[in-house]
Amino acid sequence: MNKLNFHNNRVMQDRRSVCIFLPNDESLNIIINVKILCHQLLVQVCDLLRLKDCHLFGLSVIQNNEHVYMELSQKLYKYCPKEWKKEASKVRQYEVTWGIDQFGPPMIIHFRVQYYVENGRLISDRAARYYYYWHLRKQVLHSQCVLREEAYFLLAAFALQADLGNFKRNKHYGKYFEPEAYFPSWVVSKRGKDYILKHIPNMHKDQFALTASEAHLKYIKEAVRLDDVAVHYYRLYKDKREIEASLTLGLTMRGIQIFQNLDEEKQLLYDFPWTNVGKLVFVGKKFEILPDGLPSARKLIYYTGCPMRSRHLLQLLSNSHRLYMNLQPVLRHIRKLEENEEKKQYRESYISDNLDLDMDQLEKRSRASGSSAGSMKHKRLSRHSTASHSSSHTSGIEADTKPRDTGPEDSYSSSAIHRKLKTCSSMTSHGSSHTSGVESGGKDRLEEDLQDDEIEMLVDDPRDLEQMNEESLEVSPDMCIYITEDMLMSRKLNGHSGLIVKEIGSSTSSSSETVVKLRGQSTDSLPQTICRKPKTSTDRHSLSLDDIRLYQKDFLRIAGLCQDTAQSYTFGCGHELDEEGLYCNSCLAQQCINIQDAFPVKRTSKYFSLDLTHDEVPEFVV
């Protein structure tokens, strides 16, 4: 198509060019319609990258050195520069290196991680896990955890194993990698390139036989433990008059952090896990944090500088909190699987290695002594060691003498039975007396040895064996959990409610406020929360909402007396409490039915409130 036909074609004039930057330093150039939705663009990017699970990723644009994530329901041109929306005929011709020059300069968009998870097994798609790994790689390069310097060397070893495979002497020598691509700049400056190139090959060699997928999992698990890697940072102002932001808001996987900006460093002021955040309120540019358990006078008030930034932070905080709460049962299950696998590996290596060591030592001692008693003792020890070897493996000597088809259950039960061993501790502890002066010991020494041989010791706790036999849990590197869109935007999942949008009318004025509330935990976690809270207190105003629940009957009585006043009360349920006086399940189910979609919120007011209280508890507002 020539330029004249291109400018006369209205359809082509509505086309624009976008450049998508990927976490692995690659880019995609796409021609799209100027009125496309952000969700449609994200789908196109995932199709080009062959991503099946993209719920942890998002599209962002950089505004004032901050990544602003797009609302998928909005149109793309709301986030683009003004020049990008102009007609193609009015835009100067751009360089061909950016794509088709007729569509003008491309809009720069970043495809990056929006929601962090602490375990790579939560990412079902390997391609998504690959880009998640690369995103953390870039974050690690900017990390400043000076007290965790050893972690960067371990991360570099995992990354080299994932990128280059097993260490090979004839291939991986000298400067076979760039230290700047695997270490933060301050580590390279402190240690020097020669130091890194000298010691990292040995650590790379220790990761032998790890596949790329396993190395990605280990890298993700270790990288998120650094305090400043899996974090989103946003500027905050102490008051409206500030020109330069003096505070920084850090959104982590587990909560919110507030930092004081000091020259080139950040000093941590507050660290609020999600369980300690009572409510977040955005009123225009004002941002309020109400910590759980503190009186209302102790709330923290900051400013975002723009109502749009307030809305963006509210959505990001609410979705991150919802995902964190919904993933807790899954994470507990994964930790249990991994712990059982580690115990099993440790148990097998412990039995096998110690018995092999005992056999080698006793064999040398028996040869050195040359006595008949020593040889007799060696035969007896070899019999015990053989029995113990059959216990440490599922297919022991008895399995060889009686060949038959065994399933996984049979092999597991047989290994559990063979774990009942006769101990060899007495013989190893008295090994010197057996090899040097056994004949002079007489009958007393032989009787003691016979008594020691009759002692039986259980290598494993029977309760552990019963529990493992019932669960029979196995972990594989390819095991993964699917994160669905329901975990971010669902109405109810795993007992955790979504956003509740209500219109609350004030008794003193005719105006209404849009209150967005998020319920944090299900009834399953309620007893754990109550165990952490004191049941008695001398000052009721200093109690959290969980403590106020203990005085619900008093509040119901107060509400009846003060119903005609200007104060407003909102209670979690109006039914009577159960025998324990803790919760009303029928009211929770009724409220979960009335849950609305998370966003967009009606723009009838500039007041947004995010309530992160853990339970359906009465709210006492004075």
UniProtKB/Swiss-Prot annotation:
Domain annotation FERM: ranges: 16-328
Bilayer disposition of the protein: Peripheral membrane protein
Pfam families linked to this entry: FERM_C (PF09380), FERM_M (PF00373), FERM_N (PF09379)
Residue numbers carrying Phosphoserine: 522, 525, 542, 544
SUPFAM superfamilies: PH domain-like, Second domain of FERM, Ubiquitin-like
Coiled-coil residue windows: none
Residue span of region Disordered: 364-445
Entries under InterPro entries matching the protein: Band_41_domain (IPR019749), FERM/acyl-CoA-bd_prot_sf (IPR014352), FERM_2 (IPR035963), FERM_central (IPR019748), FERM_domain (IPR000299), FERM_N (IPR018979), FERM_PH-like_C (IPR018980), FRMD6-FERM_C (IPR041781)
Domain of life from the UniProt record: Eukaryota
Modified residues annotated as Phosphothreonine in this record: 523
PROSITE patterns xref list: FERM_3 (PS50057)
GO biological process terms, semicolon-separated: apical constriction; positive regulation of hippo signaling; protein localization; regulation of actin filament-based process
GO CC terms, sorted: apical junction complex; cytoplasm; cytoplasmic side of apical plasma membrane; cytoskeleton; plasma membrane
Protein's cellular compartments: Cytoplasm; Cell membrane
Main location per the UniProt record: cytoplasm
Low complexity bias spans: 384-395, 425-438
Keywords: Cell membrane, Cytoplasm, Membrane, Phosphoprotein
Xref: PANTHER family: FERM DOMAIN (PROTEIN4.1-EZRIN-RADIXIN-MOESIN) FAMILY (PTHR13429), FERM DOMAIN-CONTAINING PROTEIN 6 (PTHR13429:SF11)
Name by which UniProt lists this protein: FERM domain-containing protein 6
Organism encoding this protein: Homo sapiens (Human)
Higher taxonomy: Eukaryota, Metazoa, Chordata, Craniata, Vertebrata
